[in-house]
């Protein structure tokens, strides 16, 4: 159907972003293809050491899934913070990722969790890391005729810690920060780290240079948090806009990196 209608057709999953864009005439489609009628696209299953989430699974269903809460609690908690109850009840994870709204939560956390998506077309299927799916603000790297059908997230391991925090004043978040740490000894040392920032840049961005500063003993890492925050801000290429100045956003990154670090450790925010 998508190959038949081509650019005249839009993919409808939850519609929370799509219908708003069509109402404001920033998107115009003559046809909408409803994925919610496709059996199995709303499933949430465990397979080997991964959680497989169907593209039309709503934020609310992921938030409430016992399987997700048990195997990747950071994801369930993040989904409980998405937008509002109405959006969580109708909006889908697959639609959220494909629409690539810059001021959104899921992709930033999925980036540090090592999430990937499966996309399919009439000619075949392929898997894309979440970090390669989003090309920019409101733009994905899906090829013509491709549909996102599944999101795959690694299950948390006992020596893995992850958390997501955001700063939000208006309808959408100003900043989102995700952190994943590997620790062999109950958070006394960290052998691997992934950190990503979203909302302050066109698409979620890994702080690769910052990650090098987030490994080592807990005391060493805590001392390096300010330098790591600067590395994250540099990677995000901050600019002045209606959400605030680049300097203000850099300050937020400093504040929330420390907060999310302590949250990962199980302590209160500081």
Predicted regions located by residue number:
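C-terminal structural segment of proteins
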Residues: 1-270
């Amino acid at each position: 159907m998508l190959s038949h209608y081509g650019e005249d057709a839009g993919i409808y999953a939850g519609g929370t972003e799509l219908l708003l864009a069509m109402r404001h005439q920033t998107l115009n489609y003559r046809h909408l293809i409803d994925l919610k009628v496709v059996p199995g696209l709303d499933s949430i299953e465990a397979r080997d050491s991964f959680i497989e989430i169907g593209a039309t699974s709503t934020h609310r269903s992921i938030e409430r899934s016992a399987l997700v809460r048990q195997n990747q609690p950071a994801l369930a908690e993040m989904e409980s913070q998405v937008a509002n109850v109405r959006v969580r009840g109708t909006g889908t994870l697959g639609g959220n990722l494909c629409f690539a709204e810059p001021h959104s939560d899921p992709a930033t956390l999925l980036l540090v969790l090592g999430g990937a998506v499966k996309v399919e077309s009439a000619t075949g299927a392929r898997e894309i890391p979440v970090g390669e799916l989003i090309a920019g603000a409101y733009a994905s790297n899906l090829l013509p005729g491709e549909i996102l059908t599944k999101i795959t997230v690694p299950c948390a391991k006992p020596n893995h810690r992850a958390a997501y925090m955001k700063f939000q004043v208006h309808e959408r978040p100003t900043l989102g920060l995700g952190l994943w740490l590997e620790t062999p000894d109950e958070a006394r040392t960290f052998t691997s780290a992934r950190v990503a920032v979203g909302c302050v840049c066109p698409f979620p961005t890994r702080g690769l240079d910052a990650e090098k500063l987030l490994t080592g003993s807990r005391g060493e890492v805590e001392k390096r948090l300010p330098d790591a925050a600067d590395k994250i801000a540099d990677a995000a290429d901050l600019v002045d806009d209606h959400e605030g100045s680049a300097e203000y956003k850099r300050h937020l990154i400093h504040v929330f990196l420390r907060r999310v670090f302590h949250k990962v450790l199980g302590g209160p925010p500081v």
